[in-house]
């Protein structure tokens, strides 16, 4: 349908200009993906308690379009919170591999980002980024639910930026 703006009444033209947005398909997909993130919770330690708090009524992650999923096949974001041991590392990788593309990873807390206070243990992985590519790091021991919401918003910005520019800003 072609609209000739010269033939329209000035009020109609102004209304159309306010309500019609021009974009690329990639930007539209990026906007849709960023506003409908479905994180898979992978709580391994005390940070998981803070992650559960995000789903409570006080913070209500649902209002941002994110719904916690329990299956990796229904998720596009993996939130790793807590200490990742060498025994747990293959399971984390398997769950990541089961997620459909596009997929993102958030490392929540000191243990997931760099090993935390257990970094010198022989059984602890020195950061989940040694197993799967991480897109957003959330520091803290443990980080509060507001920090997780901030991290999810940063991931949304990253998704939109990648869709807008065509540049991938990941370490994949």
Swiss-Prot record:
Instruction: Enumerate the GO terms in the molecular function aspect.
Output: 4 iron, 4 sulfur cluster binding; iron ion binding; NADH dehydrogenase (ubiquinone) activity; NADH:ubiquinone reductase (non-electrogenic) activity; quinone binding
Subcellular location, record wording: Cell membrane
GO CC, alphabetical: plasma membrane; respiratory chain complex I
What are the required cofactors?
Answer: [4Fe-4S] cluster
Main location, first listed in the record: membrane
Q: Pfam families recorded for this chain?
A: Oxidored_q6
TM region positions: none
Q: So what does this thing catalyse?
A: a quinone + NADH + 5 H(+)(in) = a quinol + NAD(+) + 4 H(+)(out)
- What's noted on cofactor binding? Binds 1 [4Fe-4S] cluster.
Recorded superkingdom: Bacteria
Please describe the quaternary structure of this protein. Answer: NDH-1 is composed of 14 different subunits. Subunits NuoB, C, D, E, F, and G constitute the peripheral sector of the complex.
Family label: Belongs to the complex I 20 kDa subunit family.
Mind telling me what this protein is named? NADH-quinone oxidoreductase subunit B
């Amino acid at each position: 349908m072609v609209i000739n703006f010269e033939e329209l009444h000035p009020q109609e033209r102004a209304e159309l200009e306010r309500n019609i947005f021009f974009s690329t398909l990639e930007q539209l997909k990026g906007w849709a993906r960023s506003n409908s993130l479905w994180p898979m919770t992978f709580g391994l330690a005390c940070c998981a308690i803070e992650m559960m708090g995000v789903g409570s009524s006080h913070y209500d992650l649902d209002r941002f379009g994110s719904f916690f999923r329990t299956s990796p096949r229904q998720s596009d974001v993996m939130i790793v919170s807590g200490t990742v041991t060498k025994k747990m590392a293959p399971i984390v990788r398997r769950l990541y591999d089961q997620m459909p593309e596009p997929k993102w990873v958030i490392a929540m807390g000191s243990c997931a980002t760099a090993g935390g206070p257990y970094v010198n243990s022989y059984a602890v992985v020195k950061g989940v980024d040694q197993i799967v590519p991480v897109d957003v790091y959330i520091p803290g021991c443990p980080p509060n639910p507001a920090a997780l919401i901030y991290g999810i918003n940063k991931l949304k910005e990253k998704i939109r930026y990648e869709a807008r520019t065509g540049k991938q800003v990941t370490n994949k």
